Amino acid sequence: MRHLYILLFILLFSVPVSASYILIPMDAESQAEHLKAYGITYWTLEKQLKVKWLLNYRGGSFLLPDTEEIKKECQIRGISFEVLSNSKIEEILNLISSPSQNMEAVVLEKAPRIAVYSPKGNQPWDDAVTMVLTYAEIPYTVIYDEEVLTDQLLLFDWLHLHHEDFTGQYGKFYRAYRAAPWYIKNKKE
């Protein structure tokens, strides 16, 4: 009988630990599709699943729940990922929580509603932010003066304003192109 207990004990603890998370690495060596990786994280949040953002761990990696749907979507989008066991996740989280490390695990719970302050006539390639969000497959809404003046900012969790609005970069652009026919035409529209 004692041998049976020993055998059961060995069998129980020799079974491989099942994976519980998908690690989306964000370091330059491991991830070829950084922007798409942000997109899959947003997509996961839209599915009302929580994500852990591992700040300063392998470039700010993400931990997503281990589901077949997420793995398939990562493959479709060309995103590098690693399936990790519970013990490996515990090891990573212990490292991150160490006071000697400049790292943090932040739980993301909701896909933010994103607005980009930009003229309506712009194409995604006219604006680096909208181009990145479009490529990453992160949904956003373009708003401009009319939406701001009619209190529609309340509909969004995140508003992106371009840095040139504050640094004078638009002034350089205006000085260079204010007399260009295409610029004059766009301003009239």
Regions found by a protein language model. Give the residues of each.
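Short phosphate-binding/catalytic loops that engage adenosine nucleotides
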Residues: 49, 79, 138
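Short, flexible, solvent-exposed loop/turn segments with mixed acidic/basic and small polar residues
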Residues: 14-15, 49-56, 103-107
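Helical hinge/lid and interdomain linker segments adjacent to catalytic or ligand-binding clefts
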Residues: 22-32, 63-72, 115, 119-189
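N-terminal, post-signal-peptide region of Sec/Tat-exported proteins
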Residues: 34-73
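Short N-terminal or domain-adjacent regulatory/targeting segments
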Residues: 77-110
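A short, charged/proline- and glycine-enriched loop
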Residues: 18-19, 107-114
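Sec-dependent N-terminal signal peptides
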Residues: 3-16
